[in-house]
Amino acid sequence: MNNVQLSNILHIQEASKQDKLVIFVGAGVSTNSGVPMWGKLIESLKQDLPETLRQETDDLKVAQLYKDSRGYKEYMEKIKESLMCGKISPNPIHYAILDLKPCHIITTNYDDLIEQAIMQKYQQYYVVKRDTDLPYLQYQNTLIKMHGDFEADNIVLTENDYYNYSNNFPLIRSFVQSLFASKLILFIGF
């Protein structure tokens, strides 16, 4: 290990001790549990579109076309099926994230693997799935599901979802921005 790597590790440890460590978890962490990456998810949506719409190359538009052509219920069922919700378990990375004792965890993932790991390790994190959860924070530690959650029925995946994000999630957006301004952010799985 070189001096820069050692310095970074010490910086992360110090931030954790001072309750200033935030871990931002991307889809790469869940792939180790068998969850497909973004491209594979979009490809599964594309396969069910009419031939004339399969030529679309913009991922957000593909998701939007699927949702618009199949309806919301079928869209959500397809996403849940593609992401194997309820059929997967946390992997060692999920537990390692918790071992770092971050004061907050931010994720763009829709799955509940982090929540499962939290429950198995008997740790307390208040899960924020929607703006209305923020005023009721019960614990110092939070898990912020920045792109929504299946249980809350508010995932962010389509073109319209991204376009309307600041209107649909203004408090979560502001909260995450405040964390970026005041904490050490460690990105994992991007």
Regions found by a protein language model. Give the residues of each.
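Conserved catalytic-core helix/loop/strand module for nucleotide-ribose chemistry
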Residues: M1-L184, I188-F190
